[in-house]
């Protein structure tokens, strides 16, 4: 261990974040590898170590002969201060080596508010921020993750972007980079070659111009770059890598358990949900393989909790059969199964009984909207009766805590829709009174609202975010309507949601705002204790840009969007059609009921009904 680090660790919170050495961490002999990759997560250890994508790609890269992938996380504020005072560069956990020793620096970016942390980590690593200032092949700075479906705010800082699922394209990119170093290519030569790999977007190979009103006028590829870059996906989940031997952290993390991915994609088509669109099409992992991964993961980690994870886990066709198959193992090993947020329209007593064998920590449902009209607008395809039936089932089975998630500011939302949230909570309370086994335990209902953030590649990508003042008015309206002590109301901070909306649909000009805000102290802005909206507003003012232009403006469907060179596989025509359906409160059936012609099946060689 570096002597400077030994002196620093006693002075920071949770020093285990920075020492590595965890069970199942991968160590290699530096003399036996030719490619070193610093796999960076622009948030803290506790968040990054919980990320399944990080676990998967860590294993994929380390399975390659001659490649050593090591982890790097954003330091907490106290650690950053100590690193800067000691002039100690940011380092990787496995070897403790500075990031400048690595050939590739790869960021996994799932949240726009992590953008400042990327700049901060580069600076802490003593790596030039701007891609144009990094003239050599190493270190190559790349990024992937769902937030990179609009990478334009980071275009000046990132050499290239990997779009979609990274298991295959990451291997191809590493091999190309090896070849480039071996044959002495220049960086421009490498980037031009990388742009020919499906799923690789090289921002520097696209020239962007703007109209006088600030909208994008043109996006012009050059040097043979494709006009549109389409995401990569895994075709066969049974042949894809799964991290059975995952790292067991040495300190508590957010998701400290086995995360078992049952399938990718989502059949539902909620119109606000970026993940639901960009992870299409649906691809299931076989039941037997899921069961095998569950058993082996518990054996290799010692975990006694397994989360059955997907965008909509209860839509996994053999879910009940999988639980049946795992029951003897779980009983013998005292392993509990848990599910994330549940669909209210397919929750059953049978499923609940299997979950009840573990810890009854409460159930979570996400109705998203307070009235059926608005649920139809967003294509939630869940009714109040569905929700109440599920709650009655849970209460009859002994559950006494329910969390309900909603959004405020959805397109077409009215005060009636807002007040409908309070009515839903009251109806759930009534369902408990009707169905609870033991009323002496009482009931805990938690209503949580977030501020709707329009995202690229969704049916609502053209919609405005409501103003901060209007959001806070609706929060106050709902708070006043929820008067019972048995219902707790939590709402999301408005300032961070506003900046998320700005960054999510930002263009390249946002890069100078991002850098200015970072220089003013925006480092860990995914955390409310570090976030300052005033800092960002000052940066916008200094750069001559208006944040409301990005967050609060309705876009014309004819407008060239900043991310128009990126395709998730879902066509723009389909997104427009879904938007028009939303304004008529017309729902679209799920993908298993009927193919709606979104285009995503073409990615796996299938057909789409138009």
Q: What are these model-predicted stretches?
A:
Residues 54, 86, 122, 156-161, ...:
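Short secondary-structure boundary/capping segments
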Residues 193-203, 311-316, 340-346, 409, ...:
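A glycine-rich phosphate-binding loop feature that marks nucleotide/adenosyl-phosphate handling sites
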Residues 39-43, 61, 248-274, 298, ...:
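N-terminal pre-triad scaffold of radical SAM enzymes
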Residues 1-31, 37-39, 484-610:
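Radical SAM enzyme core and accessory elements
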Residues 74-221, 459-507, 515-529:
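Glycine-rich beta-alpha loop elements in corrinoid/cobalamin-binding modules
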Residues 51, 252-288, 594-610:
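Canonical Radical SAM [4Fe-4S] cluster-binding loop centered on the CxxxCxxC motif
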Residues 40, 113, 295-403, 407-446, ...:
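Conserved SAM/AdoMet-binding glycine-rich loop
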Residues 8-38, 45-46, 203, 209-259, ...:
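N-terminal [4Fe-4S]-dependent radical SAM core
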């Amino acid at each position: 261990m570096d002597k400077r680090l030994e002196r620093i660790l006693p002075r920071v919170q949770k020093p285990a974040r920075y020492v590595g050495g965890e069970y199942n961490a991968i160590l290699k002999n530096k003399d036996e590898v030719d490619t070193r990759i610093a796999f960076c997560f622009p948030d803290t250890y506790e968040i990054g170590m919980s990320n399944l994508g990080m676990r998967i790609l860590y294993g994929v890269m380390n399975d390659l002969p001659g490649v050593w992938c090591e982890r790097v996380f954003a330091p907490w504020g106290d650690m950053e201060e100590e690193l800067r005072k000691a002039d100690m560069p940011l380092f990787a956990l496995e070897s403790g080596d500075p990031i400048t020793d690595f050939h590739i620096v790869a960021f996994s970016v799932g949240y726009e508010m992590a953008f400042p942390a990327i700049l901060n980590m580069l600076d802490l690593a003593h790596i030039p921020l701007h891609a144009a200032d990094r003239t050599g092949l190493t270190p190559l700075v790349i990024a992937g993750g769902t937030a990179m479906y609009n990478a334009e705010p980071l275009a000046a800082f990132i050499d290239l972007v990997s779009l979609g699922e990274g298991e295959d394209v990451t291997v191809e990119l590493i091999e190309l980079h090896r070849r480039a170093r071996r044959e002495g290519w220049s960086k421009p030569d490498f980037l031009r070659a990388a742009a020919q790999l499906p799923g690789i977007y090289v921002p520097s190979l696209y020239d962007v111009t703007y109209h006088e009103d600030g909208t994008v006028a043109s996006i012009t590829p050059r040097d043979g770059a494709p006009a549109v870059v389409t995401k990569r996906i895994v075709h066969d989940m049974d042949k894809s890598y799964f991290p059975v031997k995952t790292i067991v952290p040495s300190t508590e993390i957010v998701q400290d358990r086995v995360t078992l991915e049952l399938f990718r994609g989502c059949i539902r088509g909620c119109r606000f949900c970026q993940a639901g669109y960009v992870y299409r099409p649906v691809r299931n992992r076989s039941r037997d393989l899921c069961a095998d991964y569950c058993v082996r993961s518990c054996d290799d980690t010692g975990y006694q909790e397994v989360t059955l994870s997907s965008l909509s886990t209860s839509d996994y066709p053999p879910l009940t059969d999988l639980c049946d198959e795992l029951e003897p193992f779980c009983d013998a090993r005292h392993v509990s199964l848990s599910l994330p947020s549940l669909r209210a329209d397919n929750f059953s007593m049978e499923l609940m009984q299997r979950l009840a064998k573990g810890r009854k920590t409460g159930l979570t449902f996400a109705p998203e909207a307070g009235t059926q009209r608005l649920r139809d607008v967003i294509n939630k395809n869940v009714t109040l009766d569905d929700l109440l039936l599920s709650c009655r089932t849970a209460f009859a089975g002994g559950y006494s805590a329910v969390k309900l998630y909603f959004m405020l500011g959805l397109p077409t939302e009215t005060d009636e829709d807002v007040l409908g949230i309070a009515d839903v909570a009251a109806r759930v309370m009534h369902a408990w009174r009707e169905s609870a086994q033991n009323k002496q335990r009482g009931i805990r209902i938690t209503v949580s609202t977030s501020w709707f953030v329009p995202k690229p590649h969704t049916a609502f990508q053209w919609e405005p975010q409501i103003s901060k003042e209007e959001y806070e008015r609706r929060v106050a309206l709902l708070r006043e309507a929820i008067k019972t002590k048995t219902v707790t109301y939590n709402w999301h901070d408005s300032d961070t949601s506003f900046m998320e909306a700005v960054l999510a649909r930002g263009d390249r000009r946002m890069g100078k705002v991002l850098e200015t805000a970072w220089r003013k102290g925006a480092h860990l802005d995914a955390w409310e204790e570090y976030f300052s909206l005033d800092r960002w507003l000052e940066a916008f003012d200094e750069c001559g840009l208006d944040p409301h232009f990005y967050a609060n403006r309705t876009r014309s469907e004819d407008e060239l969007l900043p991310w128009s060179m990126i395709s998730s596989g879902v066509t723009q025509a389909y997104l427009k059609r879904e938007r028009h359906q939303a304004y008529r409160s017309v729902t679209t059936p799920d993908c298993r009921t009927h193919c709606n012609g979104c285009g995503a099946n073409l990615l796996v060689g299938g057909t789409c009904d138009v």
